[in-house]
């Protein structure tokens, strides 16, 4: 395994011997890459009746067409009567003249069965890297609870019930309600001739973005995306290798409270990593790299080091079986807390388990590389605690400054081209 070191390196020669010319030739052929994604973790408490929702999602790569995937993992069968997608300019407003109708197998409507998933036809639309898209979905049924990702740290919008079908409307005016959950929208694929693939950040609340800033996109993986798209960052697009190979997409598949396995007690309140790997990672298009950043919630729920490690091994083996690279991230410190209700708290024995798992991640695990986030955020005076300026206040999550430093610590060379799913 390689440690994250200097970011300077020489321009490569490809295995074909054609060097960057060959890379550019491959890049110029348009291909579908997942440019945004999220993980569903339950059903919304909001009931929709003859209403329209407008979900806001920031795609991480440019392209000339998109297709949207809608999942209904936790909902009853639902009909989407109409769907539109367009560039968001502010709040819930779509840029004038850009809202495009979405079709599913040629139809403007689609029914998604309980637990089902649908992907739209291609929609011709120019998108930029890190551009916000508004995906509007009309729900004609009554008392519908959406399958959702809660706590998306992004403002989305929906109408009052019985407002009807306003999916084609470009103004925010009818969208009088706000939510920070993501309803039905699972992912957005981008047809790109400049992106070589996608990086999936597979984790818990520290990937999901707890303690980050609403609508600011300041999670650790957001900063990785910014750096990949920056001409200033060493090892980024403007500095040699990456500007020849194109911009990698970064996809956030974090769920607050998520665990690696289901062996902990009390049981996890969302599908653990070993169970959702196919749905939330391997089903995406154009994936080249996976970052596995979990484990703290297993330990909090009384899992042993062996149980966490066995779960990580399972994920590593399955990712590598698809020909993808997998990068491990060390578990950051967690402050002691007494048990309260179903929360089993944290104590020195759990810190010892964390340190044992981290030792395995650093020295024995079959990861292709390691991101040592533990070293980035820990307190120099006490490595079993989060550095006070980097602690958001709960002793569990980084502050925005901590997330920034985590994103800045990532060696972008780790995302060099690899096999693609």
Annotate each language-model stretch with its function.
Residues 259, 266, 332-421:
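Catalytic His-Asp segment of secreted/periplasmic serine-dependent ester chemistry enzymes
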Residues 293-300, 315-354:
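Active-site segments of SGNH/GDSL-like serine hydrolases
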Residues 3, 13-202, 207-215, 238, ...:
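N-terminal secretory targeting modules
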